[in-house]
Amino acid sequence: MDASAVVTAEMVRRIADGQARLFPGTEEILQQLKNAGYRLIFLSNCKTAYMKQHQATFGLDRYFEDFYCSEDYGYAPKYEIFIRIQKDYPGSYVIIGDRFHDLQIAEKHGLPAIACGYGYGREDEFCGANEIIKDIRELPEAIGRLL
């Protein structure tokens, strides 16, 4: 087993053992957005097993219509995978993320973007964002300002 597989297996085990946490307010905000009629699509650079364990542990299927993982697309850049998402789910988009990879989607496709300043990214990665939020509970209002 290569190092990446070992790390993934350990991360999946820890999530399954209850060692992972969502940011405070995440489930309430996701439910609020879903109830408001927004279609939520998940796109991540994470490994598929890691994503699936989060789905199972936190019941993310309750909120998201679909899940896309870069591993399933040969680790193509998110902005390329997004083309597939647009075909599968036509409509308007607001890109929400905590890393420059997320903001690249918005930049390359001419879409509004919200940077999550409470996530893993650094402030210098957020230069293309229309909005920067410091807490997920700010998300509904930020989306409202962009749509």
Locate the predicted segments by residue.
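Conserved phosphate-coupling serine/threonine residues in phosphotransfer and NTP-handling enzymes
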Residues: 44-46
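Generic surface-pattern signal
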Residues: 8-17, 87, 144
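Asp-based, Mg2+/Mn2+-dependent phosphohydrolase catalytic module
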Residues: 48, 52-147
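Alpha-helix N-cap and coil->helix boundary residues
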Residues: 2-6, 21-25, 59
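Short, basic/glycine-rich phosphate-binding loops at helix/coil junctions
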Residues: 2-12, 62-65
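Short, acidic loop-to-helix structural element flanking the phosphoryl-transfer center
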Residues: 13-42, 52, 79
